[in-house]
Amino acid sequence: MKERKTFWDKNAGRYDRFMQKDRAAYEEMYKLIRPVVKAKTVLELATGTGLIAKHIVNAAAHIEATDASAEMVLEAKRDNQSAKLHFSVQDMFRLPYADQSYDVVIVSNALHIVPQPEKALQEIKRALKDDGVLIAPTFTHAENSIFGKVRAFFMKLAGFPLHSRWTSEEYLRFLRQNGWTVRKSAVLKASFPLTYAECEKTEV
């Protein structure tokens, strides 16, 4: 956790500007997410500055948006104007919520930057209702163009904590291998390929 907190705390103030380049992809993602969260209780992990939460909250019943970085959460709170949206600092590996608390869990662009992402998925599964939906869009860096690979190299030099490099196919397989049925997926065009995945718990 210390590695991620250090990097994200340091870059919290510039995060929104950094993400502007992917605005079109994110707008497309919001359109995919809104129908899924309509009138639902939602938990978002790795919310960052709350970009996704703020763009979908009008559709949801309530969103608890969390991040491991206190500085990111501070940035997220600055312009929050919705009573249905609450931000807090949480560890996605040790969530304080009861079993089956949420209709939808969103973890966007986070599983590739944490060690042992399969453990995060286990904790998500615990907090998600049995008939709930996991929304897990993730940059699939292994499909980078040459330009993307160069960009990723310099991001790594800057301290970006990339732990998993998946292709879209490898990422979806990873989700399935960890107990999820992928009911919908799409690859969105962004600075790095962005694989949108909508999942349900796999019946045992």
Predicted segments with their positions:
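A short SAM/SAH-binding and catalytic strip from SAM-dependent methyltransferases
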Residues: 104-116
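A short glycine-rich, Lys/Arg-flanked "PGG" loop and its adjoining helix->strand segment in the class I
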Residues: 118-133
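Conserved class I S-adenosyl-L-methionine
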Residues: 1-37, 51, 75, 79, ...
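A short acidic, Gly/Pro-enriched loop at the edge of an enzyme's catalytic core
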Residues: 93-104
